[in-house]
């Protein structure tokens, strides 16, 4: 990686956690990812969720149809785990190169997760098959019991679900997605080579004070929810250390403005347009730009056993203002950092 004062040239990055939705929303948001990233792990939480090879093939085609000419982008599809999923269907999709990984959502943990897994025991035959064939498990790591405080759900998940699962299936490759706590950062750092994590730009840049002090900022509301400052700092220190089992996963999750700015607003930040520059800003603030390329472009492929991309992109350090909104057919989409001035952006 070369890093003169104003330009960062890095190998083309990948996004290892992305929501593209469907229909008109998909057509609107895909280009913001496909112009920057070589590949993206696409989340399967549509309504209904992607649980079959045929559904994944059809969804992949809808994504590819939305990629503008001249963009070189490969969507990597995932299977949504349910209590009733057939292990043979999962293995067939993996062997045919349709499914790159499978996603475990605890039931009702986040958007469109009502079909999710009620308990790990319920899907043990599926997980055992995944361990056998070397298929990565992607985990939304929160418990959903009503009596557990929302700020404690990730830490509780580690002790009650994640660690028992990894003790039981020691060869299973696991990605602890969008980690938000010091507990998770420590757990992944202290784990073995079969455990990795993704981190979003919002969890590196902000903590719960930013979302709640001086007024509620619904466009910072996502799940897992922003935590207190000590957790934000632990995440920043993890990425700044150059640790090689943490990588870029934006969790970009678009919702129309009226669904965010609501008396019961949806969780998710649409950060695809600004994520890469946001990550660069964090690495610069931490004096860790030497580790930026690995986080964006190397660590993920290494964990998944895929080649790194062979093209390069440049980020430029010059102030730019983020658009206030992006037009949808019958509403608008508010991007992460809307209306704000950002330090780094992708060179056009």
UniProtKB/Swiss-Prot annotation:
Cofactor, free-text remark: Binds 2 Zn(2+) ions per subunit.
Residues recorded as bearing N6-carboxylysine in the entry: 103
Alphabetized NCBIfam families for the sequence: pyrC_dimer (TIGR00856)
Cellular component terms (Gene Ontology): cytosol
Stated role: Catalyzes the reversible cyclization of carbamoyl aspartate to dihydroorotate.
Binding site for substrate: 19-21, 45, 140, 223, 255, 267
Pfam families for this protein: Amidohydro_1 (PF01979)
Keywords linked to the UniProt accession: Hydrolase, Metal-binding, Pyrimidine biosynthesis, Zinc
A Gene Ontology molecular function term of the record: dihydroorotase activity
The name this protein goes by in its record: Dihydroorotase
Residues engaged in binding Zn(2+) 1: 17, 19, 103, 251
Reaction it catalyzes: (S)-dihydroorotate + H2O = N-carbamoyl-L-aspartate + H(+)
Subunit structure, interactors included: Homodimer.
Annotated HAMAP family: PyrC_classII
GO biological process, one term: 'de novo' pyrimidine nucleobase biosynthetic process
Positions that bind Zn(2+) 2: 103, 140, 178
E.C. number(s) listed in UniProt: 3.5.2.3
Family: Belongs to the metallo-dependent hydrolases superfamily. DHOase family. Class II DHOase subfamily.
Active-site residues from the entry: 251
TM spans (from-to): none
Cofactor: Zn(2+)
Top-level taxon of origin: Bacteria
């Amino acid at each position: 990686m070369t890093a003169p004062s104003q330009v960062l040239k890095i190998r083309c990055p990948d996004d290892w956690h992305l929501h593209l939705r469907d229909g008109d929303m998909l057509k609107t948001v895909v280009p913001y990812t496909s112009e920057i990233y070589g590949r993206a792990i696409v989340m399967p939480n549509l309504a209904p969720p992607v649980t079959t090879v045929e559904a994944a093939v059809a969804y992949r085609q809808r994504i590819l149809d939305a990629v503008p000419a001249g963009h070189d982008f490969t969507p990597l599809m995932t299977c949504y785990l349910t209590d009733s999923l057939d292990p043979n269907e999962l293995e067939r999709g993996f062997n045919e190169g349709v499914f790159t990984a499978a996603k475990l959502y605890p039931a009702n943990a986040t958007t469109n997760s009502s079909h999710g897994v009620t308990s790990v025991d319920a899907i043990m035959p599926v997980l055992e098959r995944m361990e056998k064939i070397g298929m990565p498990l992607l985990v939304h790591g929160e418990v959903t019991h009503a009596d557990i405080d929302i700020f404690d759900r990730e830490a509780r998940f580690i002790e009650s679900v994640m660690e028992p699962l990894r003790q039981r299936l020691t060869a299973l490759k696991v990605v602890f997605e969008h980690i938000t706590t010091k507990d998770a950062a420590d757990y992944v750092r202290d784990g073995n080579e079969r455990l990795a994590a993704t981190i979003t730009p919002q969890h590196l840049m902000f903590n719960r004070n930013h979302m709640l002090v001086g007024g509620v900022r619904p466009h910072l509301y996502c799940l897992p929810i922003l935590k207190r400052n000590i957790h934000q700092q632990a995440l920043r220190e993890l990425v700044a250390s150059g640790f090689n089992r943490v990588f870029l996963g934006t969790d970009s999750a678009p919702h129309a403005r009226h669904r965010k700015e609501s008396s019961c607003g949806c969780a998710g930040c649409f950060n695809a347009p600004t994520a890469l520059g946001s990550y660069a800003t964090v690495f610069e603030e931490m004096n860790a730009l030497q580790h930026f390329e690995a986080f964006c472009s190397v660590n993920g492929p290494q964990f998944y056993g895929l080649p790194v991309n062979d093209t390069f992109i440049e980020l430029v350090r010059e102030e730019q203002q983020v658009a206030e909104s992006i037009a949808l057919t019958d509403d608008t989409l508010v991007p992460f950092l809307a209306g704000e001035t950002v330090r780094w952006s992708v060179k056009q």
